[in-house]
Amino acid sequence: MNLAARIPHLARFAVALVFAIYLFNPSPTLAQEEPEYPVDPALMKGMKWRNIGPYRGGRAVAVAGVADDIFTYYMGATGGGVWKTTDGGVSWKNVSDGFFKTGSVGAIAVAASDPNVVYVGMGEAPIRGVTTSHGDGVYKSTDAGKTWTHLGLERTRQISRVQIHPKNPDVVYVAAQGNQWTANPERGIYRSTDGGATWELVLHVDEKSGASDLSMDLSNPRILYAAFWEHQRLPWKVVSGGEGGGVYKSTDGGDTWEELTEGLPEVVGKIGVAVSPANPDRVWAMIEADDGGFFRSDDAGKTWTRVNKQRILRARAWYYTHVIADPVDEETVYVLNAQMMKSVDGGRTFKPIPTPHGDNHCLWINPHNNQTMINCNDGGANVSFNGGKTWSTQANQPTAQFYRVITDNRFPYHVYGGQQDNSSVAIASRTDDGGIGREDWYPVGGCESAFPAFDPNDPTLVYAGCYQGIISEYNHATKQSRNIMAYPFLGLGADPATLKYRFNWNAPIVASPHDPTVIFHAGNVLLKSSDRGQHWQEISPDLTRNQAEKHGPGGGPITNEAAGAETYNTIFYVVESPHEAGTIWAGTDDGLVHLTRDGGQTWQDVTPEGIGEALINAIEVSPHDPATAYL
């Protein structure tokens, strides 16, 4: 199977690949046909989902406000749809449930001429790999979020920006970034002049390069600036940069475009662009390039000057690279990265503006008052009425993203998991009080990508992980945590080929159901400890495809990606059979399934035919038949 054909398989993080695998016949009775007992669907109607928390925000990459109402804002979560506040962030309400087919929001825009008109572009633009959900085009509301209509552009997948004509809400532009996994034609700048009923692709560079940003001159909305980005996500690498990148300008509402090059780098990666509402001749661009940095034009894009080359402004460019011009002061501009940075001297120097959470992705500033703004980041959205000196809370947004969840056997039982870009959590499923509050949950070690494991009958000791093979033991009785890494080396920035073990970002940690003092941890091999992590032993060979050509730098050709999420050919799921000690299943991120029935002395490749290089996200052993497992 060629790369283009198998990338879609790798991207389906949550897809259910279900196979019944009959590998052995433990007893004659299991070989006999058993009578079926159909379940009446009516019995399930009384079961309803309820939110148990924790009430702290998850990743968001899109916000917008209503210029004439300083208390009304919209937030787009990367997995939870669109949320709205009408009290300045004191409370939030989901307004997209029941209308949207997908939950990942990439861009939001409110019409300045009619705040009842809201456009939403689906599909988050920061391409995080398997944890990134694609979108299904554009949605529109004409009643301030009460109802929504789907407007098409389903195959654009990731949308980075939506711009609306300031005086005509039927004229709207969409910056389509495109499919992160493979080339596709549905990327570039789309325009509609009839409120989204029809769309025209008015700027298209090639099938590998999409629009990473779009800015409109509000004093003359026929002038547009578009940033293009050649990029691709591979499971083992983020490709950011190429000949298809660049900055483009239109002076006729998108009918024709000119590439702006004078003073800009030749080969570029991701770009953020913004024209100043205070001075339409002032245009900003944050550019990823070997000779990149923060660029300024004072002649409406004809010529450019690099005014700042600090690496902190363009670090991890594929994940950030956002520029927001102050609506009142042409010398004031914001750059969003891990920190929110502000310049008041035309981009020459920047100072950080503290936000409630790091990894900042969006900022909307009220055009009438530059002290009123809403910011979003990996912890949710927050509103400020004093230019970022103080912010509203993120502890009122049930939009967290969890990598894995597991329960114990206490009463009431607790649910454990790792929240993306936040801590691990153990939270009560119910309480004797009026609700589940902050006092009813606590962190249990590890970090955002925790894969918790414990004795379900006595979860005093919790084993939880983090990226690059970090694993800790948390003692809830003493509230202490200790590092028990199998190989205590943090290889940030190192090529996986140079590491002893290749650990997935969400590396499995499993406690044996037969002896909870035994824990398993997986890299490219399966590791076992029988003494609470004091010592580890390898109980398998490399169970992955072990493709050496995929063990190089995590990013390129311009910027390396150092955090470790691109480490590939790893074991992604491990489960020991509840029926037999020593019977262990292991699935990898490259589509292999292995089984041992003797505690790891021998392994059998039991990969079902036809899977290809897919992500084995979960393996469930049947509680009724030890010979059956589901992928």
Language-model-detected regions and their locations in the chain:
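Beta-propeller blade termini and top-face loops
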Residues: 32-631
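Bacterial Sec-dependent signal peptides at the C-terminal "C-region" and cleavage site
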Residues: 24-34
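Bacterial N-terminal signal peptides
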Residues: 11-26
